[in-house]
Amino acid sequence: TVLVLGTVMLFSCKTNMKDVDAIGNRNGMPEMSGENMELFYSDSALLKYKVITPLYNKYNQDDKKYDEFPKGIHAELYEKDGSMVGSITSKYAKKLEDEMLWELRNEVVVINAEGKKLETDLMFWDMKKEIVYSDRYSRLTSGDQIIEGNKGFKSDQSLKNPVFNKITGVVEIENKP
């Protein structure tokens, strides 16, 4: 009777592996998500930048680790002394963790400490190399000049030495009192 009872129990408790896999499979789902967040990024206990976002998703998959900001960001960048040196806004952003590379899309605006304003629809920020670049139309407003590059630009991240591709013109802006 013990053998019969054990056999009945063995066959009555059957696990469907497809059901188990479906429960454990979270591919495509964020590991962490949050709304109306402020994220602080530091290095050696010094604040490097702060990101404010309405929606944050963190993905930690085997081959890809990235943070996604599907509703955009406002980021503030800081010097070692704590002074703010610039800001970045965009309607969409994604940060690849291992590469330390930001992809910013849709109405990207960068303003540096000197007040230079860069506008483009797509920009990459390589934090390892400390450069920003784009292959799309870009516009830099600096004081009384506007520089437009039809094929993008490349610059240090502080926008002190931008190089534009296929410049369409430098326009002097007249400031009237």
Set out the residue ranges of the language-model regions.
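Mature-chain termini and adjacent capping regions
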Residues: 1-177
